[in-house]
Amino acid sequence: MGRRKLWFALAAAGVIGGLVGIVLTELMHFIQHTAYGYGADGAYISFREGVARASEGRRLGVLILCGMLAGGGWWLLKALGKPLIGIKAALKQPLQGLPFLTTVFHVLLQIITVGLGSPLGREVAPREMTAAFAFAGGRRLGLDEDEMRLLIACASGAGLAAVYNVPLASTLFILEAMLGVWTQQAVAAALLTSVIATAVARIG
């Protein structure tokens, strides 16, 4: 029964990773299009070209807004939220996991500021949000420490796979960077979550 719970949680993490990738990507694009005023006609325009077409005043205003949201948002997060726990830290204490609401707020801040022009990368946000959802689900299922560690690592890779469409690279990322082991169970779990997340993102 315990193994069934684990593999159910891993498959669910793959689905969640794909959905998180879709939602966060669409949110980022919506913010980009709205902030810089392009793409309303449905025609594809790259972010770089869209920003270049915007007036200097609009670009300046968006960047000022970005700075205000980033500074104010992360100040509020630190003042009112629980301490942030990164994925690497969560893997060391998997039963402690990631604080759900704090992580979600942190992820949304990342996506909003990236959409407005912040140089932050967009790959951390889906990894963190997928891992936070997976931890919440794993805790409800009563997974033990080793199972939770595997789930958090695989969920993190699933978020990466969904955003960049790289299931095999994400599998290697989980095994090498997150877990540091190549057991049969770890390989199967990493591959399962990465492939499911990529498939869901492609369908979406």
Description of each model-found segment:
Residues 1-204:
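Alpha-helical transmembrane segments and immediately membrane-proximal extracytoplasmic
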